[in-house]
Amino acid sequence: MRLSEKKVVLSVIVLLLAGISIVGWLFLSQQPQEGFGIYLSESNELVISDKDVVSYNKNSHEIKLTARGVEKIKALKVPMTGSPFVIKINGKEIYNGSFWVSVSSLSHSGIVIDTLKIQDNTIKIEKGYPSPEFFKGTDPRNSYEIFDYFQKIGKLIH
């Protein structure tokens, strides 16, 4: 085989491998999302999964996290204007909110998780920022889908 033929064969092999890699990545990225997850709205990046959750308190909407879950929350780069998230169960969007930082001077009328207020490895899903008085709309946190899911996996607290 001549050198030019070897280059053509090598180029075809490289292109095939690249194509297979791209198709594989696309396939895996479109797989249904299983379980509970808090995802960044803009990138669909999973921030917290049920593997990061120790317990979910139905009454206070507090989520006790594993040490790894706390690290993930602390690693978020949340701007003063917040970072939108969506809570999903098995890929179905349940409700939206925003990660927020308690040093922000901006108010927010939606659901928030203040990433700077982690206490005892626990985050809280709250109405409005800086207080519930700023919240507008219907409170989506009392979702039977979330409660049922955590009940089934033994992580729901009353």
Each predicted region: which residue ranges?
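N-terminal Sec-pathway targeting helices
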Residues: 2-16
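A structural signal for conserved, well-ordered secondary-structure elements
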Residues: 19-158
